[in-house]
Design a protein with these regions (language model features):
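Short, glycine-/aromatic-enriched active-site segment of Class I SAM-dependent methyltransferases
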Residues: 93-106
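Short alpha-helix
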Residues: 106-128
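A conserved beta-strand element that flanks and buttresses the S-adenosyl-L-methionine
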Residues: 26
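Conserved class I S-adenosyl-L-methionine
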Residues: 54-86
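A short glycine-rich, Lys/Arg-flanked "PGG" loop and its adjoining helix->strand segment in the class I
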Residues: 37-49
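Conserved SAM-binding strand-loop segment of SAM-dependent methyltransferases
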Residues: 2-18
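Conserved S-adenosyl-L-methionine
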Residues: 126-136
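A short His-aromatic
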Residues: 29-33
Length: 159
């Protein structure tokens, strides 16, 4: 418990907060499952001017041969982290092997890297998605919107 931190469960894209409430809005491993345009409009509504939107999520993309050194390094780090955090790793494995998790993935597949990258980088010009960890067919990525000012809207449709 922390007096300046709270977690909220929401249903649908409407966020139950006043306009300009937050300095930072985060999405951890969930943005890929949501309807991006309505949610992003709500996130911008609840952010204070100059606020940031931070995302850590998973995308799907096969590893290229030129990326094998990075893949090996990330695999070794992941194995080391799993050993160091065995209790967390066991809980994670239990979660992702649960039938409800598998059913959820059936209806909400992981987004492709190029789709999420295009979406975020086109709506926050000058900002870049970054790979945190690489696996054979997926990556953990991070995105920092940078300071977001009110009234700046990039209206685009997916090509």
């Amino acid at each position: 418990d922390h007096e300046h931190l709270s977690f909220q469960k929401i249903n649908g894209p409407v966020l139950p907060f006043e306009d300009a409430t937050f300095d930072v809005v985060t999405s951890l491993m969930s943005f890929r499952y949501l309807d991006w345009d309505p949610l992003l409009a709500e996130i911008k509504r609840v952010m204070k001017p100059g606020g940031k939107f931070l995302i850590i999520d998973m995308v799907t993309v096969p590893v290229a041969i030129s990326e094998y050194p990075r893949l090996l390094k990330d695999k070794m780090r992941t194995k080391r982290d799993q050993k160091a955090n065995a209790q967390f790793d066991a809980a994670l494995q239990k979660l992702v092997s649960h039938p409800d998790w598998k059913k959820m993935l059936e209806y909400n597949p992981i987004r492709s890297e190029h789709e999420m990258k295009w979406y975020l980088e086109s709506r926050f010009p000058g900002q870049k998605m970054e790979t945190l960890n690489m696996a054979w067919n997926s990556r953990i990525v991070a995105f920092d919107s940078g300071p977001v000012e009110k009234g700046i809207e990039v209206k685009l449709s997916y090509p």
